[in-house]
Every structure is written in C-alpha cells, then in structure tokens.
C-alpha cells in the first residue's frame, strides 16, 4: 500500500531524549529498540523521494498492505482495518512511531491531500493511510484540526478531553505548575523636579547634567514611588484566575513580576516561586507565557506566518517526551488511539517544523482562521482589524508549550461574545489540560466573569481580595457593600474601591456610611476566613517531590543554535521578499544616479593630466559617499523592527546574534546588486582604466563599502533605538568617517596629533584601494615637472601614495570593519533595554500624593449638575440604502473570489435623532466602524452609494465637519502636549469665533471635569506603549477633545474599548449627558456591561457582511430587542440576569443562522419594525417647515490668523518638549562645529593658502559643513513631522484648520531653532577654521548657513508629506542628497559640467550655498596670489575662472538662496493639503 503526503521542504529535528516530561515511565529494557526493529522486519516504512522534493512517498509493506481492496462496509471491518494498520506501525522503532500516524483519506469523492489511486471502486469511501506528521501539507493540517474542532463552542472541550483520556489510560499526567509569591514589593526611582514634570529642553539638559553629577558623586533629588506593596498569593494548576483593579493599581507590574519580566530599573523584593523553585533557579520566561496589552507585530507578515514563527521558536517543551512515554505504554497495553488525536499530538510534538499544526489549532480557537493569510498591517497600512490584532497578540504567546499563562488585558477591542469564547477555551485548557492561568480584564461581562475560578482584586498596589469567586460577594457584604441585581459583578468589584462610586453600594442603611480605604479592605481581608486560608497555604512549603522535573524550563532557548539561526534566516528572507519594492527602488535609484554621474563625467577628460586626475579622484569619492548614503534607509528599517525584536528577545524566542547574522548575510546580495548596478554603468561611461582586473577590483571595494555602510547603520540603530535619535547618530558617524577619510581634508593637511584618525576610518581604506587601483595604471605614468608620474602626484597630494599591495590590505581592513560593525550590532541587540525604560520625572506635588494615597484630596463631582450649555442646533442624520465597496484584496482573489469590488455595507437604512443615545453593534468585522466612517465622511477610498441627509438636507461634508465630532477608535494625539492643552487647543480651533476666551476656558474646564481628566490635566499625553497616559486615559482624552467642539452630532467609535468598568461608566455617563442636552449621539460598542448597554435608547445591529438585522428601540431592560429576537422561531430564550448584548450577538451569529436555516437580514427587512422605521426616515428626509439648510460664512470656525496662532502655539510646545529632536540636533551642531574647527584649524585663513589644493581643502570644509549639518537637520525633521502627520489627518478631517495655517505654523516654528543652530556654528567653527573676521564676511556666512539649514529642514518636511512612510521618504531623500552632492560644484566645477546637465547645477540649492560661501570669503582676494596647476594666479581670478563664481552676482545669488526655503515651505503646505496616505 502506498500513500503520498504533501511535505514542506524543511525537515525537522526529532528529539530523542528519554524518560521525559510529566510522566512516570516504567523501566523499559535497554534492547527494546532492537526488538522493535526486528519485529518490524516484515513491516517496512521507508521514504523514497519522488520527482519533486516537496513530496515524499511513504512505502508501507507487510501487513499494512493487506485489506486494501474490496468493498464491504460496517463499523467492525473499519475497526479491524484500523487495528491491523496500527499493529503494523507498532512494530516499527520508537523514533519512527513518534512521527507516523494514520489519517483518513477520501477516495473517489475527492480528498484533501494526495492519495494513491486504485481500489475501492467508484464510490467515495474513507480509508486510513499512513502519514509522516512532519510532512503534512496545509490542507491536511487544516483538515485534521477541522475534524477535531469543527465548532469551537462544542468541539474544543471534547478534543481536550480525548487528549486527557488518552494520557490517563496509560497513566501519564501532564506537567503542572503552581505559582506563589510572598511579600512582593516593587518600587521605582524618580527624579523630582519643581513645577510640571515635562521633558522640556531645559529639564532634559538638567537631567543629563544631574545624572553626570550623580556619577561623579554629587547628590541629586531622587524619590521612590511604591508600585506593589507586600502582595502575596497563589495561582494553582487547573484553575483560572481573574485579576481586576482600577488603572494604575499595579496589575501589569504584578503580571510582569510573576513572569520574571520586570524592567531592571525597578527595585523588587520578596519571593516568587514556581513549584517551590525560585525564579533565579530556572528560566521563567520559558516556563510562563506573558501576553502584553500592547500589540507589537511585524506589519508585513501574515497572521499564519506570525503564529508559525512563534510556534517554531517556542518549541514543543515536554510534549515530545510525553508523547514518547504515551506510545510506549500504549504499545505495551495494546491500545489503539483515535487517529486524528494521535496525528495532532504527534504533529505538535515535532521540534522545529516550519509549519505547525498548533498554529491551525490556535487560529481556530482564537477565531483567526478567516484572516489567516492577511498581512497584519499597522496604523498607516491596511491589515487585520483591531480585535483580530488583539487576538493575534494572545495567540502568538499561547501557541507555545508554556503551561503558565499570564495575560494582560486580552479583551480590549473584542466584542463580548468573542471574549466569552476565548476565555471559555482558556477555562477548558485550565480545567482539562491543567494549565495555570491568570488573566487581567477590564470589563468582563457577567457570563465571562462566571468562567473564572478565583478572583484577585487590586487597589493602590495592594491585594484587596484573593480567593474563590463564589466567596467574594460574601466578603464585600461583610464589609457593608452589596452588588445590585442588574449590575455586573466585575463592574461592582472595581467601582466599590473608588471614592466616587463606593457609597451607592452601601447596604447597611441603619449605619452611617464612611469611605472605606484600600488599606481598610486589606485589613478586613487578612482577618477573613479566605485571607487566613490563603496565609495558611502560603505558610506551607511546596512539596517538591510531587513536582514533575520537566514542568520548569532550565534552557534559555527552545531550539539548538543551528535551528535558531535557520528559523531567523527564513523569517528575514520572508521580510526581504515582502520589502522587495524598497530594495528594487534603491537599486533603480543607484542605476539612475550611475547614468547621471557617468554622463556628468562622460569621457570629456582624455588628456590624463593633473586636472583630469582631480576629476577622476572626485568621481571615485562621489561613488564612495553615494554608496554610504544609499544605506541610510537600512537605519529606518532596522529601528522600525526593534520593538518586535525586543518583545521576542525578552520572551527568549531567539537571541540577538541569531537576529543579527541573517540581517547581515541576507543583505549581501543587495550590496552586490548595488555595487554591480553602479560599477557596470559608470565604469566605462566615466572612463576608468579599461582593464578587466581593475574593473573587478573596483567592484569588490564598492561592494565592501556598501556592505559596511548597511552594517554601520544597523549597528547605530541598535544603540540609538528611536527614529528621532538614530538618523542624527548615523549622520554623526558618517561625518567622522568622511572627515577622516582623506578626501575632504587630505591626510597631509590634518593636524599631526589627529592623523591617527585616518587609519580608523573605513573610507580611508576604500580610497586607498580605489585610487591605487586607478592611478597606478599604465596610462597615468606620464612624468610631471616634479619628477614623479601624474598618478603618483595626485596620490601624494592627497596623502594616498601607497604601494600596490595596499589594495589587499584595504580589502582586509574593510572586511574587518564589516565584522566589527556586525559584532557591535549583535552586542547592541543583546545588551540594550527596549526604549521607554528611561528614568521617570515627577513633580514635588505628585510625590506628596503618591506617598499618601489615601489622603489624596478628591472632589465629589456630581455628573450632570452642570450641563454643556453653549448654544447649538439639534439635528437628525438620516440615510437610505447606503452601500460601500472597496477593491477586492489580493488575498481574496488568490482564494478564488473573482469580483473586482468587495461590498462591505449592504443597503443600510436608518436615522439617528437628537436627544437619543444610539448604539451601533455587531460582531468584530461586521462593518460598524465602516458605517461610521461613511456617515462622517472619513473614508479616503472606495465607492459610496446612497442618500445621507442632515436635518432633511443633503449632507455637505465641509459643513458637516463643523457640526459633528468623531471619537476615533485609535487614540491619536500629539505626544508632547498635556491633556489640558490638547482639549484647550481643540476648543480654540473648533468653537465659533464669537465665543470669548473666558467662556471658552470655562467650557474646557467643564469638559475636563465631566470626563474626570481635571486631575491629570498637566500630564503629558506621551507615546502609546512607551510613556505618558494609560490606554483608558487616552480614550477619555479622545472623547474630551471631540466634546469640547460643542457638536450637534457626535460619532464615537468604541468609546469604552480599553477602559476598565469604572472608566467606561464615567465615559458613558458623560456621553449620556451629552445626548440629554439634545445632541445626536451614536456609539459603536463591543462588550458593554448590562448597565452601559441599557444606557442606550436605540440600537442598530449589523451582522457580518454589512447587513442590518435590527434598528429600533431597546426598551426597559432591553425588552424590545429581546422580544423581537425571541419572536423568531428557534432562537433560544435569554437566561435570567444574562447580559442582553452578549445574548443578542450569540443568537444572531453566523453559526446560529446556519443552525436555524434563516437569514436575519431578510427577517428584519420584512418586519413591522422596518416598515415603521422607513416611514420615520421618509419624514426625516424632508426638511421641517420653516428651516433652512446649514450655512457658515467661513469654511473654518476661526479666521486664518487665529488658526495660525493656535497651530503655532501647539508647535512651540511640541518642539520645546521634544529634546530627542531639538536637543540632539543642537548637540550634533556643537559636535560638528568642534570637529571641523579642530580638523581645519586656521586652514581658512588666507595666509595659509598657497596652492589650489589649499583652496580645494577649504572648499571641502565648506561643502562638508553644509551637506552634513543640512542632511542631519533634514533627517531629524522627518520622524518628527511623521509623528505629527497622523494627528494632522485627524484634525484636518475634523475641519479644525486650513492645511496652510498648519504648515505655515510648523515652518515658522523651525526658524528660531535654525537661527540658534547657525549662530552656534558661527561662534564655534567660524573663528577656529580661520575665516576672515570682518563684519561683512561674518554676516554673509551666517546668512548662508541659516538659509541652507532652513531649506534642508523644509525639504525633510516636504519629502515626508509626499511619501507614505519613513522608509520610502529616506530613499527619496538620499537621492536628493546625492544629486546635490554631484552637481553642487564641489565634485566637478560648473565649467566642466556637460551642457545637458548644467541646468541641474543651476537649480541645485547646494550650488548657490557654495557659491555664496566661497565668493564672500575668497572672491574679493585680488591681491593674494597662489600656485594653481603650475601657474601663479590671484585667488579671486581662480575662483572666477575655475569655479565660475562671480562676485558681481552676489546679490542675485543671495535672493535665489533665500527663495529655496520659501519654495520648499510652499510645496510642503500644498502637499499636506493634497495628499493623504492614511488608508480608510
């Protein structure tokens, strides 16, 4: 009998360790393997390669071949067949049995996977075939998982029970882990400042000096803040525990502490043990899986690839050893297992597989199977939804073998039914597979809450309760608090700790209520029976004898070094393919520049004299700097991937060296292509020596230079870590390398005490290799007047006169630098902590609050006593037959969907009315956000059909943005301004001009108070996941920023997503108040509690596919919705106290539709509710009598000047508080000025210039100063502008300002900083280099530097505004820099530039910079003579004749130079008004 199964080309490593995890195996005879082999001599399984290496044929002979033909049926015959084939497998050696299994294959009726032909007649019949689980194809893996878990809700528990029963039948138990912790304290050290604790330039500078002072022994004001305070507890195997508490109470810190992942800057005391073993005695990161609340993934990888690589790196743990023990005992007992369970268990026990069946299983239970082949995406690139991203974050960690799961806020962005399903699966893993699970959730619905066994309540860094769920309400009742009947228990438990909410739950009406603090609750808990029981359990030592030796991991990595490296290679290769566009763009860019360069230097200089030699020298230097700059995009790409790398590294998926080696080796072909594309085009165009060996030697050096540049930028990125600092550090490194490289300043001209620097620059060796290769050729052997050859003369002048063999020394040195950079890269990846872990800054006031939490003064805000009283017009929004189409994604076309357009919304009809709070609900991916975007006019692509009316009149987008507010799901805010400033800024620009400043300020204060942001109004917003506000604070800020605009219509996309129950209640109270003022409020909502859901007046429910299935009133206690759906035959009735929103989503799910055989959309279309709604909408579609269409005299609420002032105010604050941008470029300018001053000490003095080389050297100085400080300013401006761009998109959609006002403010804000940078240079470098110390020349130099730095900054802003992301912007920017370099008049004087390129010289801003600098310094020196190319000339005449710089044209040159920053600023304003790269 023959079977053929699909196989991946990657073979796996099979573990053969004996006596394995979680088992107590009997003593097997040592010769058992030989007996197996002997017994199996009549039943042979061999692998024979077919015609294609992706297929493997298993040849099974002996008894397995019997019984293959014939018809017949009956269960007995099938069982006999199974036993006979299984018996044949049992005769094989253990190593073969571990990988072979029986899988069903349908013959005659089609099959999933390849099956052999023959037998069985024509009818379809299912037969078992022997397969090697290592080589299962994608279809076969999916088929196995589908058979085991066809319906997650019912089949998952059965599958786990089958696995458990199989193991129990042979006495094998899974490894279990108990986690306990005693008196754990965690504290952070903060630097204390006076006033607001903001990272301004001043505070940042003081912080650096204070840290330096501390290292030198001087004291500075530090304070300790307690995060966790004496917390103790136990989480046991087979139990799932819920962790609850308000934001900032220490939940995340506790989870990280238990997982052994606390930041090293935090001080931790106390004991944490796994099975009685302390954390430092094993590897907790490999024993437990910590699921972060932040979603960090590689945007270019698909969901399946992300999970496959995670599964591969995490390994199989003790599964292989457990499987080995199971099959041995089954053989001894004569047990035949279920084929599918056997195949699954064996497949997930195979180490190092490229594609894992565990991935298919995790995707199934997490609901990710439908988007398995979709790229993850990010904020600027379309990908999976936010809910799917959150599930992927969870799946990525639990796909591994860890039996301890520590999960932080895994339900954010998920609807309540999806959360319930995921937690159900986790509960089953705990109860059946004996996992130990601790989960932190924000707003668990009652039915999700009921799935947990134990509850931990935290407050202010302390444990308020830790014990069984069924005793927690008794505990709080003993404290005097009772949960109301229709209140979710989780909501009650979080609110009962809050000073503002506690009183409403006081149940002892006969006693006077007093606020009970967290400390009082803790004391009551310790005195309670549950608290005493916990203390008793903790006092008992864990019995290590009952612990399984394989329960804890003692190895840091799951794979061998070779397999780690290979897996990282596969991943890097995949990402290179996905980013092929970037690599192709870079190669094309180099090719085009090679053509331009070749035609600029095009064989016009065939005299082979000293002048031509200078041109050839210039072309070689240009090639070197071009290849160095061409690598800059590598820096941006490396830094952008670091957050994901740090996550994986901290989970011990792979080490830094395994990431660094593939990043280096796989870029070698890219460097080879770059060097080839340059050399092949430019070599003969420029006219280098036409000898093949010299061509290949030049190619080799340029290849090594490009490889070294990429390696250097990766190394710099690994230490600088952020996109703000990285480009500046890279430019600084490039500057040092070029200054000591021997071209800008020849080695003989360097100060003697700095000449050693020449030998530390890789560019020096590249120049030695290239120039020696060219100028030692026979054609340069003509003897000059000085008695040496022309080739030797040019080399001597440049200090590059070395013997021929130095070429190979140079090659060896370049290889050494490449290795050095890559070793540095690997070390940087290994030792550097992820960014965001810097020292915290805190104010004196905040310190006092933190040290006395319970004394914190708190105002009792009675929400609703003050109303948002500014005048507005109540408006109804109605819409009929709204459809929305997008282009079909490529992934769907690959799967066979042939339509060009994909419909996301289908004939949606409805209306939202003033004073009525409407909920828009549906499962994840139903189209809720899409509908809001369509109604709000936020879509940037796709086709919209249908009629949308505002107050009966057709919607006009410009007018609509004035009277509406949109709270987006993603909380996008400027990171460097405070909460209060964000809200004030929104009010300034969005409230009508007639509202005076005092009223506006009062309104802002009122909104901050209502949303409970007044206590953190001075807190910096910060960057999500790095610093600043927490997730729930950002969400409340998003709501406040929109409410402060006093809108008539408010759209809110997931206003409670990411909030805990109390924060969600605060937000919804505020939203309800807004609706009660007569405004129209619409919210999409995922997982509302009963209380939040029933706060709504009307509901619009959309099913997957964008079809409406209900639109109408909720009714008292949701009675109208319940009544409607229960009237549909077959729909199950709602249970008592069940959350109506969860029930509604469950009974309208796709699976329920299939089960009932109905279409809820069709039922709704034919219902009386729909007919009533249609009549209502008809009325709303007609303008009420006596009304007129909305009209505003101006497009924006404020006049242009006011918009400009507001934007300038915000830009001022952002610049002042971004030291990573401004402080770093100030430091760079100071560093550059010092190094130029030292290297060119007094070489600009006219008395020290004797020949043309002296002039060329000082021109190189001017060129180097301008190009490097310019590039640095441009590169550092790009990430700063990119961060603000996403905020600008939101503000522009809201109609806050004209793009011109925004751009002019951003442009204007750069001027004082650029003035400061230019002045800094003039004070340090100008006198040290020795330029003429006259007022006129000083002012001209200052003016030129200022304009140059300004146009470079504005160019950086412009290039970001016309490109989709920083990587592409970097590539285009590097093209600009290199074109400037080539045609600025430095590499080749304008008189020698061919006429077909001279126009580029005249439009190049750098050419005017050099013109002004050189002319003002040396163009008036008529009385100073120098020796130039063998003749004596006045400096002024040489400047005019050789460079074409005419002093008469100085005023014109100054005007043209000033025009460039103006031009770039205008183009920037135009670009941000025209281009939008946000895909919605």
Swiss-Prot record:
Domain of life per record: Eukaryota
Residues noted as binding ATP 2 in the record, renumbered to the chain: 922-929
Residues noted as binding ATP 1 in the record, renumbered to the chain: 245-252
SMART domains in UniProt: AAA
UniProt KW keywords: ATP-binding, Membrane, Nucleotide-binding, Repeat, Transmembrane, Transmembrane helix, Transport
Record's signal peptide: none
Transmembrane parts of this sequence: 581-601, 619-639, 656-676, 699-719, 725-745, 811-831, 1226-1246, 1254-1274, 1311-1331, 1340-1360, 1368-1388, 1396-1416, 1449-1469
Compositional bias annotation for Gly residues: 63-73, 107-123
Domain ABC transmembrane type-2: 563-775, 1202-1418
Gene3D superfamilies, A to Z: P-loop containing nucleotide triphosphate hydrolases (3.40.50.300)
Annotated spans, Disordered: 1-42, 60-81, 104-124
Domain ABC transporter: 212-485, 877-1129
UniProt-listed PROSITE patterns: ABC_TRANSPORTER_2
Cellular component GO terms held in the UniProt record: plasma membrane
Compartments it resides in: Membrane
Membrane found in the keyword field: yes
Any one GO molecular-function label of the UniProt entry: ABC-type transporter activity
Topology in the lipid bilayer: Multi-pass membrane protein
Biased composition (Polar residues): 1-18
Protein role: May be a general defense protein.
Family under the similarity heading: Belongs to the ABC transporter superfamily. ABCG family. PDR (TC 3.A.1.205) subfamily.
Name of the protein described by the UniProt record: ABC transporter G family member 49
The species this protein was found in: Oryza sativa subsp. japonica (Rice)
């Amino acid at each position: 009998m023959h079977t053929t199964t699909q196989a991946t080309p990657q073979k796996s490593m099979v573990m053969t360790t004996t006596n394995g995890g979680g088992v107590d195996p009997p003593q097997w005879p040592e010769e058992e393997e030989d007996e197996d082999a002997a017994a199996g001599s009549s039943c042979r399984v061999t692998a024979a390669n077919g015609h294609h290496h992706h297929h493997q044929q298993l040849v099974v002979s002996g008894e397995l071949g019997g019984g293959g033909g014939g018809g017949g049926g009956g269960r007995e015959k099938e069982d006999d067949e199974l036993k006979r084939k299984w018996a044949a497998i049992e005769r094989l050696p253990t190593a073969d049995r571990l990988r072979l299994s029986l899988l069903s294959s349908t013959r005659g009726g089609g099959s999933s996977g390849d099956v052999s032909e023959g037998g069985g007649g024509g009818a379809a019949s299912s037969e078992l075939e022997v397969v090697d689980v290592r080589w299962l194809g994608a279809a076969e893996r999916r088929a196995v998982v589908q058979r085991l878990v066809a319906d997650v809700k019912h089949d998952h528990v059965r599958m786990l029970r089958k696995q458990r029963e199989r193991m129990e039948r042979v006495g094998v138990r899974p490894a279990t882990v108990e986690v306990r912790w005693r008196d754990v304290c965690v504290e952070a050290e903060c630097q204390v400042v006076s006033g607001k604790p903001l990272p301004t330039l001043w505070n940042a500078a003081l912080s650096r000096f204070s840290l330096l002072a501390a290292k030198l022994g001087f004291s500075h004001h530090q304070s300790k803040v307690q995060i966790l305070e004496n917390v103790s507890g136990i989480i046991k195997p087979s139990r799932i525990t819920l962790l609850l508490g308000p934001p900032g109470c220490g939940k995340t810190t506790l989870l990280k502490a238990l997982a052994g992942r606390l930041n090293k800057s935090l001080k931790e005391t106390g004991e944490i043990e796994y099975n009685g073993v302390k954390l430092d005695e094993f590897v907790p990161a490999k024993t437990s899986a910590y699921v972060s609340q932040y979603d960090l993934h590689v945007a270019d990888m698909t969901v399946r690839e992300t999970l496959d690589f995670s599964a591969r790196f995490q390994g199989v743990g003790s599964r292989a050893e457990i499987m080995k023990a199971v099959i041995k005992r089954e053989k001894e007992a004569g047990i035949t297992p279920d084929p599918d369970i056997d195949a699954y268990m064996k497949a997930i026990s195979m180490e190092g597989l490229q594609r894992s069946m565990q991935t298919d299983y995790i995707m199934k239970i997490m609901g990710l199977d439908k988007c398995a082949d979709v790229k993850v995406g990010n904020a600027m690139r379309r990908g999976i939804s936010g809910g799917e991203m959150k599930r992927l974050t969870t799946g990525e960690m639990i796909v591994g073998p860890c039996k301890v799961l520590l999960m932080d806020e895994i339900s954010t962005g998920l609807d309540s039914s999806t959360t319930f399903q995921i937690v159900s699966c986790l509960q089953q893993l705990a109860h059946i597979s004996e996992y130990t699970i601790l989960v932190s959730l924000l707003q668990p619905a009652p039915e999700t809450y009921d799935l947990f066994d134990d509850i931990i309540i935290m407050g202010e860094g302390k444990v308020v309760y830790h014990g069984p769920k069924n005793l927690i309400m008794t505990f709080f009742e003993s404290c005097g608090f009772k949960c109301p009947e229709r209140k979710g228990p989780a909501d009650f438990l979080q609110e009962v700790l809050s000073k503002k909410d506690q009183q409403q739950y006081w149940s002892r009406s006969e006693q006077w209520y007093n606020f009970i603090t967290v400390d009082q609750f803790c004391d009551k808990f310790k005195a309670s029976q549950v608290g005493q029981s916990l203390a008793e359990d903790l006092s008992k030592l864990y019995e290590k004898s009952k612990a399984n030796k394989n329960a804890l991991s003692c190895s840091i990595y799951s794979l061998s070094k070779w397999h780690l490296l290979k897996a990282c290679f596969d991943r890097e290769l995949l990402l290179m393919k996905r980013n092929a566009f970037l690599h192709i763009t870079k190669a094309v860019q180099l090719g085009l520049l090679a053509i331009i360069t070749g035609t600029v230097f095009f064989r016009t200089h065939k005299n082979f004299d000293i002048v031509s030699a200078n041109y050839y020298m210039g072309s070689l230097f240009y090639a070197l700097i071009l290849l160095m700059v061409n690598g800059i995009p590598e820096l941006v790409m490396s830094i952008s991937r670091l957050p994901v790398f740090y996550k994986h590294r901290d989970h011990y998926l792979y080490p830094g060296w395994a990431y660094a080696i593939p990043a280096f080796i796989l870029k070698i072909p890219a460097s080879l292509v770059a060097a080839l594309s340059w050399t092949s085009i430019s070599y003969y165009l420029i006219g280098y020596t036409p000898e093949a060996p010299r061509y290949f030697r030049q190619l080799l050096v340029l290849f090594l230079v490009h490889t070294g540049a990429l390696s250097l930028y990766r190394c710099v990125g690994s230490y600088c870590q952020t996109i703000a600092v990285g480009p500046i550090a890279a430019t600084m490194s490039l500057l040092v390398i070029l200054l000591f490289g021997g071209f800008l300043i020849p080695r003989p001209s360097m100060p003697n005490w700095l000449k050693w620097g020449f030998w530390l620059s890789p560019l020096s060796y590249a120049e030695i290799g290239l120039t020696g290769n060219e100028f030692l050729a026979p054609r340069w052997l003509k003897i000059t007047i000085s008695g040496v050859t022309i080739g030797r003369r040019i080399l001597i002048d440049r200090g590059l006169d070395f013997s021929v063999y130095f070429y190979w020394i140079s090659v060896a040195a370049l290889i050494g630098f490449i290795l050095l950079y890559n070793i540095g890269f690997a070390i940087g990846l290994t030792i550097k902590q992820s960014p965001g872990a810097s020292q915290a800054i805190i104010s004196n006031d905040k310190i006092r609050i933190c040290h006395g939490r319970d004394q914190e003064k708190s105002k009792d805000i009675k929400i609703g006593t003050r109303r948002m009283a500014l005048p507005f017009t109540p408006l109804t929004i109605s819409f009929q037959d709204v459809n929305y189409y997008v282009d079909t994604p490529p992934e769907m076309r690959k799967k066979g969907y042939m339509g060009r357009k994909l419909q996301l919304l289908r004939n949606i009809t409805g209306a939202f009315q003033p004073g009525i709070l409407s909920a828009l609900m549906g499962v994840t991916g139903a189209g809720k956000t899409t509908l809001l975007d369509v109604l709000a006019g936020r879509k940037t692509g796709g086709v919209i059909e249908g009629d949308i009316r505002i107050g009966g009149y057709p919607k006009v987008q410009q007018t609509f943005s004035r009277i509406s507010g949109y709270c987006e799901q993603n909380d996008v805010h400027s990171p460097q301004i405070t909460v209060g400033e964000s809200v004030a800024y929104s009010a300034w620009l969005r409230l009508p001009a007639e509202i005076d400043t005092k009223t506006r300020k009062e309104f802002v204060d009122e909104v901050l108070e209502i949303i409970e942001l007044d206590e953190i109004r001075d807190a910096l917003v910060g960057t999500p996941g790095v610093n600043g506000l927490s997730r729930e604070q950002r969400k409340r800020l998003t709501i406040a920023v929109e409410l402060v605009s006093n809108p008539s219509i408010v759209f809110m996309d997931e206003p409670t997503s990411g909030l805990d129950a109390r924060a969600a209640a605060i937000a919804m109270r505020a939203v309800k108040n807004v609706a009660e003022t007569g405004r129209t409020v619409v919210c999409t909502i995922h997982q509302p509690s009963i209380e939040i859901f029933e706060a709504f007046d009307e509901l619009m429910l959309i099913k997957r596919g964008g079809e409406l299935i209900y639109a109408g009133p909720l009714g008292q206690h949701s009675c109208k919705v319940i009544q409607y759906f229960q009237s549909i035959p077959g729909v199950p009735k709602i249970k008592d106290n069940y959350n109506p929103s969860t029930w509604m989503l469950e009974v309208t799910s796709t699976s329920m539709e299939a089960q009932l055989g109905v279409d809820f959309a069709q039922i709704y279309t034919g219902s009386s509710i729909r007919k009533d709604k249609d009549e209502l909408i008809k009325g709303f579609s007609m303008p009420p009598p006596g009304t007129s269409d909305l009209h505003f005299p101006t497009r924006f609420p404020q006049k242009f000047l006011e918009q400009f002032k507001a934007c300038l105010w915000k830009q001022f604050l952002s610049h002042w508080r971004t030291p990573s941008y401004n402080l770093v470029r100030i430091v760079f300018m100071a560093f550059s000025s010092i190094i130029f001053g030292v290297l060119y000490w007094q070489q600009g003095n006219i008395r020290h210039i004797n020949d043309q080389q002296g002039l060329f050297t000082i021109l190189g100085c001017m060129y180097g100063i301008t190009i490097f400080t310019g590039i640095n300013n441009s590169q550092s401006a790009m990430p700063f502008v990119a961060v603000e761009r996403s905020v600008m998109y939101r503000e522009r959609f809201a109609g806050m300002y004209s793009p011109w006002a925004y751009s002019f403010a951003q442009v204007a804000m750069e001027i004082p900083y650029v003035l400061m940078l230019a002045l800094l240079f003039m004070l340090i470098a100008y006198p040290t280099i020795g330029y003429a110390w006259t007022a006129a020349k000083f002012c001209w130099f200052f003016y030129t530097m200022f304009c140059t730095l300004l146009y470079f900054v504005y160019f950086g802003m412009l290039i970001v505004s016309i490109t989709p992301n920083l990587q592409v912007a970097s590539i285009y920017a590097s093209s600009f820099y290199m074109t400037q370099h080539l045609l600025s008049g430095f590499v080749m004087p304008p008189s020698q530039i061919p006429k077909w390129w001279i126009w580029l010289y005249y439009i190049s801003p750098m050419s005017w910079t050099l013109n002004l600098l050189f002319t003002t310094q040396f163009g008036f020196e008529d009385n100073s003579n120098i020796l130039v190319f063998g003749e004596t000339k006045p400096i002024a005449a040489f400047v005019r004749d050789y460079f074409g710089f005419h002093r008469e044209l100085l005023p014109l040159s100054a005007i043209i130079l000033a025009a460039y920053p103006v031009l770039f600023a205008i183009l920037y304003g135009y670009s941000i008004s025209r281009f939008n790269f946000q895909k919605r």
